[in-house]
Amino acid sequence: MENEAFVDGELESLLGMFNFDQCSSNESSFCNAPNETDVFSSDDFFPFGTILQSNYAAVLDGSNHQTNRNVDSRQDLLKPRKKQKLSSESNLVTEPKTAWRDGQSLSSYNSSDDEKALGLVSNTSKSLKRKAKANRGIASDPQSLYARKRRERINDRLKTLQSLVPNGTKVDISTMLEDAVHYVKFLQLQIKLLSSEDLWMYAPLAHNGLNMGLHHNLLSRLI
């Protein structure tokens, strides 16, 4: 019995050693075997690169198509805006022609105002030219020069007469001339009274009665 147990133990130990050697040989063979990673690439197990390479062109085509669509859409959006701008500019150009104000077009209204203003300017310029010509004609006419000098002399005489006639500067020209006539008659009466031997004493009375009309009576007596 003891021999059989010993034999069995030896067999088990031999089997264990055999298994160990086989495992070690398998490990050495596994270690000495060429590396499968060197033979098989990662792309064989996970072909993401090929997928990306195959789809890259499609992605680029899609992106280009999308960008073209975006550009086309932007151009389509810009075209109506350009049309709107052109239409607004055309409206601005045509509005002054078609605008109305108080039942009358602004163009005709403005044109009529301009014509009126031009007419007024032309009329004023013509009137000024006529006045200038008239003034030049009057200044160059010898008769007008003589008449002007005569008026100046008359004005000087009137001023002198106003200073001689009593209260002549306090009244107008016509009243002053009437007073001047009466004053001259009174002076004539005074001269006659003073030159008469019989009536010289009436001279002060004639002077004081100038405003009462006594000088008329004295003149009638002298005549």
Swiss-Prot record:
CDD domains: bHLH_AtIND_like. It is found in: Nucleus. GO terms for molecular function: DNA binding; DNA-binding transcription factor activity; protein dimerization activity. SMART domains: HLH. Residues 138-187 form the bHLH domain. Residues 64-113 are annotated as: Disordered. InterPro entries: bHLH_dom, HLH_DNA-bd_sf, IND-like. It comes from the Eukaryota. GO terms for cellular component: nucleus. Keywords: DNA-binding, Nucleus, Transcription, Transcription regulation. Homodimer. This is Transcription factor bHLH139. It comes from Arabidopsis thaliana (Mouse-ear cress).
